[in-house]
């Protein structure tokens, strides 16, 4: 029995009432849970001997707003330009029938030498998730980053301030509906002799298509998915 198989077996037995989905792909184990079950799940994963996840190595937000969408209409093909190399496609390559936002945690057990991904989806109308900073100190800045970039609130965080964006920044730049060029630009005004903010004068446009494909490293190697 491999380490992942052992981990999956223990998760199915000990956390069956708290997780909604368990998957294993490309040598990685992922579980999903509801927001209200996050803290009970995380406490079990940290404190139970067979799990012993003593390190939170990453926490991030995800926005699935345009997940699976193509950048161009591809209903017709011509002999010139980008569309000449495009086959007819469906409206979406992939569909996610879940809330728009998710929070993803990556856990590591230095004692058991195994890893786990924990994911929970959050309703856009109620972007509040319990903080886990009291379980892993590394969560402090990770949660601040997710708040700054996605607008996800972490209930119980001791200092939930922006971490990366400028003072007075409006919006959350990693959201898919945030303009790539931003809302305002900062420049030095020679007449006023100070730095000012002004609306951006860049017109957003697509110059490189979004490519949706299966990673060719794993094509024809299905057996490795469940290692």
Swiss-Prot record:
Q: Which GO terms describe its molecular function?
A: NADH dehydrogenase (ubiquinone) activity; NADH:ubiquinone reductase (non-electrogenic) activity; quinone binding
InterPro entries assigned: NADH_DH_suC, NADH_quin_OxRdtase_su_C/D-like, NADH_UbQ_OxRdtase_30kDa_su, NADH_UbQ_OxRdtase_CS
| Enzyme class (EC, first level) | translocase
Among SUPFAM superfamilies, the record links this protein to:
Nqo5-like
**Alphabetical list of HAMAP family matching this protein:** NDH1_NuoC (MF_01357)
Q: Which family does it belong to?
A: Belongs to the complex I 30 kDa subunit family.
**Protein name (database record):** NADH-quinone oxidoreductase subunit C
What organism is the protein native to? Legionella pneumophila (strain Lens)
């Amino acid at each position: 029995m491999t380490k992942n198989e052992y981990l999956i077996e223990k998760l199915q037995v000990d956390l069956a009432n708290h997780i909604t989905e368990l998957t294993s792909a490309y040598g990685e184990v992922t579980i999903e849970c509801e927001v209200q079950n996050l803290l009970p799940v995380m406490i079990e994963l940290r404190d139970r001997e067979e799990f012993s996840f003593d390190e939170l190595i990453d926490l991030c937000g995800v926005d699935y707003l345009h997940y699976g969408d193509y950048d161009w209409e591809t209903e017709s093909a011509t002999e010139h330009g980008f569309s000449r190399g495009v086959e007819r496609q469906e409206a979406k390559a992939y569909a996610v029938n879940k809330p728009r936002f998710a929070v993803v945690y990556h856990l590591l057990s230095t004692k058991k030498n195994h890893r786990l991904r924990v994911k929970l989806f959050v309703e856009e109308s109620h972007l509040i998730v319990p903080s886990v900073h009291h379980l892993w100190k590394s969560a402090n800045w990770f949660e601040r980053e997710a708040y700054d970039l996605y607008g996800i609130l972490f209930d119980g965080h001791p200092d939930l301030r922006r971490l990366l964006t400028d003072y007075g920044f409006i919006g959350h730049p990693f959201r898919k509906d945030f303009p790539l060029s931003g809302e305002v630009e900062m420049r030095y005004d020679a007449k006023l002799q100070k730095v000012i903010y002004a609306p951006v004068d860049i017109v957003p446009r697509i110059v490189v298509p979004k490519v949706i494909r299966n990673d060719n490293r794993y094509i024809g190697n299905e057996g490795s998915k469940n290692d």
